[in-house]
Every structure is written in structure tokens, then in C-alpha cells.
């Protein structure tokens, strides 16, 4: 069995990054000990997750469950822009009840054998507005800002 490198770290319940890279180095297969959601904005990217290949389109949502072996290949002829959310499994589990489960999207992705969601007109959706507000909340250092971010995320 091949050995894969664990990459990234998470020292909070969740973290959001908005990144744009003009040039991205090739990344070997790896895994994380947290869940990851990537909202692809622009670029030319192929994601390999657990042996399945996805050529991304703008505003695709990529779901990578903790422990999933994955890598991406980026065509550096154009900028690669995305929003990434790292989520602690403990955070997801803390909000699980009989009536709802925050990890449902990851479970459904596994069941349907597809780690990519395509939402028509994503930039017009309420999800897009919510993500934009959540992203903006990370610039606010006011009273209880971390709690505010958690509430927005939920």
C-alpha cells in the first residue's frame, strides 16, 4: 500500500481562505485530517479524489472528506482562484442531531460517487451571498467575532 503525506493543519473549528495563484506547484497525492470544501472560481484545474477525475468549471463546489486521497493539477496559463474552507470533524459532529447532520453533504457525495457539486447560477444564489458574508467576517476582529463566524457558518 502506498504511503500518502498528510498536508495542511487546522487549529480552529474551521478556517476560510480566498486564494488566487498565478502559478501553482504540482501537489502529490495527499490527505487531510479535516474536511475541506473548495469553491472553484476560475482557472483550469483537474481534481483527482479517491481515483475519480474532475475537470472543474467556475463555481463548482468540491467536497473532500477527511482522509480522502486527492491531488490537483493546475494549468498555470491562467490564474487559479478559489475559496477553501477547512472544517474540523469535531465541529461537524458537535452540531449533529437526529434531525440534521452538517456532514450530510460529504455522506451524499460518497453515496453518489461524486465529490463535485454544480449549482446553476451560483453567483446569484443565497449560498454565494452567505459565503461572501462569511469571508468578509474574517476581517472583523470585534467582540465575539469568532462566535459570529461560527453562527454564520452554520
Regions found by a protein language model. Give the residues of each.
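Amphipathic, well-ordered alpha-helical segments in soluble domains
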Residues: 36-39, 126-133, 152
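Glycine-/small-residue-rich active-site loops that bind phosphorylated ligands and cofactors
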Residues: 54, 77, 141
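A generic structural signal for short coil/turn motifs at secondary-structure boundaries
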Residues: 49, 73, 142-143
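Short hydrophobic-aromatic micro-motifs
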Residues: 62-65, 85
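Generic protein-terminus/edge-of-domain signal
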Residues: 1-61, 68, 100-104, 111-115
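A hydrophobic/aromatic-rich effector-binding and dimerization subdomain
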Residues: 2-15, 73-138
Amino acid at each position: 500500500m502506498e504511503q500518502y503525506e498528510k498536508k495542511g493543519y487546522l487549529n480552529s473549528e474551521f478556517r476560510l481562505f480566498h486564494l488566487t495563484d498565478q502559478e501553482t506547484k504540482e501537489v502529490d497525492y495527499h490527505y487531510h485530517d479535516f474536511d475541506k470544501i473548495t469553491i472553484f472560481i476560475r482557472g483550469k484545474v483537474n481534481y483527482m479524489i479517491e481515483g475519480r477525475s474532475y475537470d472543474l468549471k467556475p463555481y463548482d463546489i468540491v467536497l473532500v472528506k477527511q482522509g480522502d486521497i486527492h491531488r490537483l493539477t493546475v494549468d498555470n496559463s491562467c490564474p487559479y482562484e478559489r475559496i477553501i474552507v477547512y472544517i474540523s470533524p469535531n465541529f461537524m459532529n458537535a452540531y449533529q442531531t437526529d434531525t440534521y447532520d452538517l456532514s450530510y453533504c460529504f455522506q451524499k457525495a460518497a453515496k453518489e460517487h461524486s465529490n463535485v457539486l454544480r449549482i446553476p447560477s451560483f453567483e446569484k444564489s443565497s449560498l454565494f451571498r452567505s459565503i461572501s458574508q462569511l469571508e468578509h467576517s474574517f476581517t472583523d476582529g470585534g467582540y465575539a467575532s469568532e462566535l459570529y463566524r461560527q453562527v454564520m457558518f452554520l
